[in-house]
Amino acid sequence: MPCKRTICFIIIALSLKLIHAVRQRGTVIRFDFLGILLITYYLSLITYQMSTQPKIIVLDDDPTGSQTVHSCLLLMQWDVETLRLGLADDVPIFFILTNTRALTPTQAADVTREVCQNLKSAIAAEGIKDFLVVSRSDSTLRGHYPVETDVIATELGGFDAHFLTPAFFEGGRITRDSVHYLFIDGVEIPVHETEFARDSVFGYSHSYLPDYVEEKTGSKIKAEDVERFLLPDIRSGTQERLLSLQGNQCGVVDGEKQADLDIFCQDILAVAAEGKRFLFRSAASLLTSLAKLGKQPIPAEKMAEYKPTSKPGVVLVGSHVQKTTQQLGELLKQPGVAPIEVDVVRLRDQPGERETMLQEILSQVKAAYDAGKNPVIYTSREELTFADVQQRLDFGKQVSLLLMDVVRGLPKEISFLISKGGITSNDVLSTGLGLRSARLLGQILPGCSMVRTGESHPQFPNLPVVLFPGNVGDKDGLATVYGRLSG
């Protein structure tokens, strides 16, 4: 299809020809004026179209993918009418929180399929023509790849390529020469050498992304067939190469700093304007470059301004990765906290004690709150073993249900809620708080989003909620966020 600039020049040429024709008929003033109006109208239209970004639709497998943007909508439901809210919103990006990382591969595929089918109806109803689709997932390569991207490609079809872009600079994740690294205590570690690669559900053996793709696709995509977009390529421009891609070609993308993805996304958007269609399997930093939203309204250090009361707040810690455990230890050293442990071994071994456990936890929360303390509710830290992945997922749901009952039983005038862990945060938004959608305020710490409930929320109106991923931040990260909100 011709590009918008070409169309613009054609319109100008035709308009000038019209003016010339009417000059020869002797009605110069009247038709010159009409011709100028015609040119102005079409130039304005084309300029608007050229400056308008495509809608960026993010299917987020937990609620932390918005950790580099602000002001957009997070949708906890995906019926057609709710999706239309996101599509019609003035902000160019919105997130659909599918929480598929907490599901089995089959369940993840079913949810993704339902979202895509509803999206097709919502896109048609809103008359959206230009859009990009991002399957947002973990910057440490955990998640249902290629299950989700395969379903998206089938349902929304016609993609020329899909790209893996796992760089997340705020969290210390970079990609160089197609190898994905984590910074741990200032040292670059190939991601396959970290605890995340040993995840009992999403484990893997490779940091070299083409090999990771071959491993995860069961050799359906060979490593040698993966297009590698290296730093020198990106920094010198990739438009011609992007234009040549077709047939949902798999590509992997380097990134050492945000400027690298800025350049890459500039080329992506230019080529997309020519009619190419791309799908992304991405961490959060790509979204910064695609959305181009600028600075958030209130800086991180001053986000306590969003608190509706001066009462104590609550911290809920569900994530059990080593980084979270370290951060929890530092948090519990802070003044004004009241530690409340949820004994998950007791829940597993004595499921009949669940209601008793719930009442015990809520009693401790009330006592701490009444004493002016900030309750820190956290699951016991031992990593439990199960016979298979399904048993582990099922028990994880039982833990989550208990924690969400705790959320629903919190004092109504708490001033903030910090949720630690991606899956925990999703459940807090969709189940504990029962939200259909929420507006993102921004980041209170690099990689940590804050949203706020609406004024009409039946239990916690205008409550700021921090979505803190389990694998983000240094050892003082959780204590820093707590300090910014409790001070």
Where in the sequence are the language-model features?
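Cap/lid and interdomain-hinge subdomains that line or gate substrate/regulatory clefts
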Residues: T52-D60, Q67-H70, T82-L85, P92, ...
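Conserved, well-structured core segments that form the ligand-binding/active-site neighborhood
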Residues: Y181-I361
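Short, flexible loop segments at boundaries between secondary-structure elements
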Residues: A283-K292, K302-E305, G442-V465
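C-terminal structural cap/anchor segments
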Residues: V365-A368, G372-G422
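Structural signal for terminal/edge beta-strands and the immediately following C-terminal loop/tail
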Residues: S437-R439, V451-G487
